[in-house]
Amino acid sequence: MLELARRGLADLGAAFKLRDIWWALASEDIADSHRRTMLGPIWPLLNYLLFVGTLVLVLGRGESPNFVAYVSTGMLVWLFISDVLTMSANLFSREEGFIKGTVLPISIYVMRQTLVISIRSFYALLGAVAILLYSGFAVTPALLSVLPAVFVLLLAAPAVAVLFGIAGAFFRDFQFIVVNATRLLMFITPIFWTDPGAGGLLGFLYYWNPLTHYIDIIRMPIVDGTIPTNSWTVALSVTALLLASALIALGKFNRRIVFQL
């Protein structure tokens, strides 16, 4: 396993040496996705604002004292996570032309996708900041933990991309499973519902859904001014497991992916 992890690290290192390539490819993806549109990259911002606005109007003030901030931050993180899950499932199939026509490291396509999703999320972030400034939130020392929390989320994203991308390359139905599972996950992840504070199904889903903890390490410092240590423990543990698994999988399958496309 150590040898496989070493190969995975070598592929990742080669991709970072060619970071100008995946930066250029990601920039092209963003430009192409809004080509000949009037609003261009403002669309991700509008989509986010419409989504959050609809939830707040339909659900009212909810059970949280600052429900608007609760939903807006939860939805921001969720949109990033859902993009990572759904786009990763057909990542290498989508990059078939490049993979078959070049000898670039496989990790380049992973980093390209991660950068594209991050740029799109940045536009949504502008909307989240505007909502938070309008609805109000307390400035506390806990806010300092938001940046490292975002870093943890960004570390997990390429690891998921590797694992899901490989699974999707070998099992083409995987992408459809992931799309449908992600739709379900939106409702069993506390994006717009709060901690029930008791047992039952909601309590089980809240505490045992790892996505809860990725959301809470970013959301709780903003909404409650607290640092959720339990969520940090879960998020760091899951991220470490994802990274280790991704490196091993990358080392084992990086040269075999091309033959599955």
Positions of predicted regions on the chain:
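Hydrophobic transmembrane alpha-helices and immediately adjacent juxtamembrane helices
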Residues: 1-261
